[in-house]
Amino acid sequence: MSELLLELFSEEIPAFMQKNAEEGYLNIFTKIFEENEIFAKVQAFAGPRRITLYATHLPKVTLPKETEIKGPSIDAPEAAINGFCKAHNVSKLELSTKLINNQLYYFFVKKTEEREIKEILPEIIIEAINKYSWAKSMFWGDYKIKWIRPLRNILCIFDGEVLPLQFGHLTANNIAYGHRYRLTDNKKLEVTDFEDYKNKLSENHVILERTKREEIIKTGLLELANSRNLNIKEDNRLIEEVAGLSEFPVVLLGKIPQKFLELPKEVLISSMRTHQKYFCLFDKEGNFAQYFLFVSNGRFANAELVIKGNEKVLSARLSDALYFYKQDIAKTLESRLGKLEAVTFHAKLGNLREKVERVAKICSYTALDNTDLITAAKLCKSDLVSEMVGEFPDLQGIMGYYYAKHEGLGEEVAAAIKDHYKPQGLSDNVPGGNAALLALADKVDSLVGLMIAGEAPTGSGDPYALRRQALGIIRIILENKLELNLNDLIIFSLKLYGNSADKDLITSFFEERAKFYFKNDYDIALINAALDLNLVDTKFKLDSLKEFLVEDAGKQLLNAYKRASNIIDGQKITGLVDASLFSTQPEKELFEVMQKISPQVTSSISDKDYNKALNLLSFLLTPITSFFDNVLVNDPDPKIAENRLSLLHNICELFDKVAKFCRL
């Protein structure tokens, strides 16, 4: 068996694209090999400057094969038959026929001769290279090929020999290159096979395997953290990213000047993790430590110089942050409200100052006399025009929290400002207390306004993430058990925009998102039966119905309802029942039970005790079964027939008070 080694050597590939490229090229090569009936073991490796493919167990030659290709029927127009022949470069005389389902079809037997594998590998490789689609790619120079970054070299060896491969301006060879910063005179590494390739890269400070680089980083982080008796929080995403920035990772320890530790910890984390790709350290009590860890791309003779350089870069960034922070705390959040007038919320919806005023009114509507909530609502966007958030946009809300605390506005106000953007996705936590009410108001105002502005999601896009916003609203209501009607809240919000025409569009949108939210736990028929925009009430109904309808009594009662509903469907019914017209015992008993339980069912619904309401409906099962078994509904006497139809109509209405049983 033979082996293939391919390396695409380029300028730096963005770290966040490397893992996808590794998996993508692996899948593409595997699939193309299988399509050509070449069954090989394929491995892929991605790094900052190279994508490598290694295939083993390759045959020397491909096996000859015959493939039967179905053509048109013999009765097809001559043009179709000629087209089939032309497509496969055969004459009509070379076609055979076969009977399929009493119809004769033309067939062509395509014969593939035995070929040496090295003859077809260049075709496969070029196809695979072109087939992978980078999220972004580029042309360079005056070359016609396109890739993520300029390609500098292609190494391609099959069984120790260079394959005759041409990709654009590049001709394949057996040359690899080591670490960019460890090369002497741009040293070329001649390789003969995969083991030789891997060893020579390692000798020249390149670790081929992404997973191995990640493991080296993890080990180095833990060792250095433990050496200072400090803790490091697990951050696999950052480890994966820095492994994509380094061909030969070395973990080093730097120190933070004491003066910067007065900054909020989120500022330190954002500066270090997001902007510098550094790892934060904490003491055993969870306090921010005066040290940080970073990954150097290579082991250098003077590690102290590398450390000092990184400390200097971090100090410069933190100096700016400290300056911005001191500038910001010199002003109150309220003093920044005027600046919000210069920030557009949406071209059709005004500015952020107007938005916070609407949000405050929605908060007043949902929670009367909650002073802390209204204060938080009016100030929740003020930090957006602060120096710090201008520099670190990911700290919106968080800086508002610290500024509110600095002003002495209290934890309730500060926490509501901090958490009012939550939840920002299905995995994000839902806020509680005043933060929940503020988050709800902010999201409702945004969603209603953007729907009015014509930004409703479509099949092709949702640029303002309104589907996610709606799910956030639904989660806030349900997880905080907020007893409010979303329909009323939508109407109130629309009034603040001076609009009422879009109510049906918005309520329908929320209903669809609520169905999407509930469908993981409940059957769609149950959801359709129970759903309204009092979502907490809907949840109670769903739980009760789900439990009730798995019982035999529940199933029988549902069947009885459906039978009654089918009988009255399409009938003109007054709904007025005259007990004096009853002539049979079953209808009398059914009427008496209905009258007895009806007020109790209504009371249970008011108390949101749907278990009790459904259990009360169960008392109808015996009399309604007897009614159907012994009473002719469509009596020859029209008055008696109408009276019995009205009785069934009233029973169905009683069921539908609990839930829309007609949808089950």
UniProtKB/Swiss-Prot annotation:
One of its GO terms (cellular component) is cytosol. It comes from the Bacteria. InterPro entries: DALR_anticod-bd, Gly-tRNA-synth_bsu, Gly-tRNA-synth_heterodimer. Keywords: Aminoacyl-tRNA synthetase, ATP-binding, Cytoplasm, Ligase, Nucleotide-binding, Protein biosynthesis. Its EC number is 6.1.1.14. It holds the Pfam family tRNA_synt_2f. GO terms for biological process: arginyl-tRNA aminoacylation; glycyl-tRNA aminoacylation. GO terms for molecular function: arginine-tRNA ligase activity; ATP binding; glycine-tRNA ligase activity. The keyword Ligase applies. Its main location: cytoplasm. It is an enzyme of class 6 (ligase). It is found in: Cytoplasm. Belongs to the class-II aminoacyl-tRNA synthetase family. PANTHER family: GLYCINE--TRNA LIGASE, CHLOROPLASTIC_MITOCHONDRIAL 2 (PTHR30075:SF2), GLYCYL-TRNA SYNTHETASE (PTHR30075). This is Glycine--tRNA ligase beta subunit. It comes from Rickettsia felis (strain ATCC VR-1525 / URRWXCal2).
